[in-house]
Amino acid sequence: MGLKISDLIAKEMPLSPEEIEVVNTLIPIKEFKKGQLLLKEGSIARECYFNIKGCVRSYQIINGEERTTQFFVEGDPIASLLSYLNKSPANHYFECIEDSVLAVLRFDDEQKLYNQYPKFEALCRNSIEQEFGKQQEILQNYLTKNPEERYLMLQENRPELLQRVPQYHLATFLGVQPESLSRIRKRIAHRNKP
């Protein structure tokens, strides 16, 4: 794997040779297998990630059942911010649901990077703000739309997930049982028939 994080960052902002060396040292790219957990509930997040290839889901276990709260695909930052910043136990899991390639940044290395090169803080802040906006939209949709409307929004805004993610994970993300998701899909398909 010849890809380096500097290749991706250079698309967003120019990097000096020194900065290239530093970011490639502090932010290694690692491969993770499908099913591998990046974070467990109750542990402290000491790393954040940037998804280069693959799909990661965030989920919680509520009353013994998994509830998916987010899917992270190529180009998405992956962070348990409260745990990472406050050094408090996480209340969720991060699981690779495909073989994944992620850039990995440890908290201490992030601080070194910001202290040495402040321009990276603005880049990371922008990424976090975009992810925060996505989270707000997910919450708003969950509170104001019924499962069929949420499915249609997912179909419109993130259609790749419908092909990549197992139906049972999609169902928990939408807040329904897999059987209900099957009925929703059939209803939509029936309505869309010519």
What are these model-predicted stretches?
Residues L38-S43:
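Short phosphate-coordinating micro-motif centered on Lys-Gly-acidic
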Residues R67-N126:
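Cyclic-nucleotide recognition modules
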Residues P28, C55-Q60, V101-L102:
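Short beta-strand segments in beta-sandwich/barrel cores
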Residues K145-P194:
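Phosphate-/nucleic-acid-contacting segments
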Residues M1-P28, S83:
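Cyclic nucleotide-binding regulatory module and flanking cytosolic helices
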Residues G35, R46-R57, E74-G75:
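Glycine- and acidic-residue-biased ligand/ion/polar-headgroup-sensing regions
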